[in-house]
């Protein structure tokens, strides 16, 4: 945000401008006859933020979710994702598939008809280089039975010293080394820490963190302890 007096009005104006830009893109696709053969995705990179005069609470931007940008709570990482592709994606369909942005490149390769993209685009001279993502094209196209699923999803934010890992409905958030466990099936706002009641699940998710984490002097986070 710029230094303006009416930050709420500026935010509303930015939303209106973005809406107009999306409309211009859609109109241009239609004018060129490409609207029926173009996959259009509207999404975001993170939840609401507070910097620069932003006021997430005023607009209710987090909805039913807790947390902000650079936090591992759902409000910081769960984002809108709208896909539009006439004659391919069923209008009005809803999916509860758990996926992440690194799934988009495999998805784009898949819908473009590129086979064996993992081998084609892996730099074998770089140790560990490869695709972490899974194509979500089957879900987009209504073929849920063919959809592969992640065993878990993982996040780190050094700015807030938080680590998050989700497996199914279980979500472990580590804040400055302290693990907190939530069951998103009945606690989407992440209010009730049930780590003490489920130490076995905590330990399973902590083991995932220790497997996924790579130490970095630039991006430091505090690892959790095992129960």
Q: What are the functions of these language-model segments?
A:
Residues 16, 20-23, 27, 63, ...:
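Solvent-exposed, polar/charged alpha-helical surfaces in well-ordered, non-transmembrane soluble domains
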Residues 27-34, 109-114, 141, 199, ...:
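Sec-exported extracytoplasmic/periplasmic mature domains
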Residues 48-72, 89-93, 97, 102-184, ...:
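C-terminal cap/loop subdomain of S1 sulfatases and analogous C-terminal strand-loop tails that border
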Residues 3-4, 27-88, 100:
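Histidine-centered active-site microenvironments of extracellular/periplasmic hydrolases
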Residues 4-17:
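The substrate-binding groove and active-site-proximal loops of carbohydrate-active enzymes
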Residues 187:
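Intrinsically disordered, low-complexity polar regions and short flexible loop motifs
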Residues 15, 22, 39-44, 81-82, ...:
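Beta-strand elements within well-structured catalytic alpha/beta cores of enzymes
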